[in-house]
């Protein structure tokens, strides 16, 4: 994988020109009635989709890359974090009032791999977004991440979602 050859998101108005119109229209439609959420996939989740080429229930190729070529995986995750932050910033500037970061494939990771390959890159993306829009609430959701909920509490997100595995009376 040639990470340096990947195209950065320099100008979202050019790469996703429809987004400003759609989010702007939705914002006008929902104004005073509902909060408009923007959303992004997290770097690990997007990397898994990219490496696997589709949704995959095991993510074997992604895990193989994580452990056999960690330098490439880290460079790829860093690239995604920076670019997905730019995309999220664009959504906010187009009218999104809250942003949710979905770590849809967290359940494929053990706690240690979550700490190495998912958390730092999701947190980097969130920090980059917060630099530009510190007052925009950001929600982080790690599907299956309840097993390592404690590891998420120091993230830059304003809110951490819990999944169905959490016993709410223990919270």
What is the predicted role of each segment?
Residues 1-4, 60:
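Active-site gating loops and adjacent loop-to-helix segments of metal-dependent hydrolytic enzymes
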Residues 3-16, 74:
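The substrate-binding groove and active-site-proximal loops of carbohydrate-active enzymes
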Residues 15-171:
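Active-site loop segments of alpha/beta catalytic cores
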């Amino acid at each position: 994988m040639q990470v340096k050859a990947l195209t950065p998101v320099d100008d979202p108005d050019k790469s996703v020109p429809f987004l400003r119109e759609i989010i702007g229209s939705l914002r006008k439609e929902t104004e005073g009635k509902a909060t408009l959420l923007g959303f992004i996939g997290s770097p690990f989740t997007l990397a898994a989709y990219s490496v696997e080429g589709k949704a995959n229930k095991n993510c074997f190729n992604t895990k193989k890359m994580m452990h056999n070529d960690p330098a490439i995986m880290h460079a790829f995750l860093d690239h995604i974090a920076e670019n997905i932050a730019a995309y999220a910033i664009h959504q906010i500037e187009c009218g999104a009032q809250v942003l949710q970061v979905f770590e849809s494939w967290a359940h494929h990771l053990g706690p240690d791999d979550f700490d190495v390959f998912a958390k730092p890159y999701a947190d980097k993306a969130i920090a980059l977004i917060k630099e530009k829009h510190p007052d925009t609430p950001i929600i982080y959701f790690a599907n299956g991440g309840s097993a390592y909920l404690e590891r998420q509490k120091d993230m830059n997100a304003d809110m951490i979602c819990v999944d169905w595995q959490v016993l709410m009376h223990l919270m």
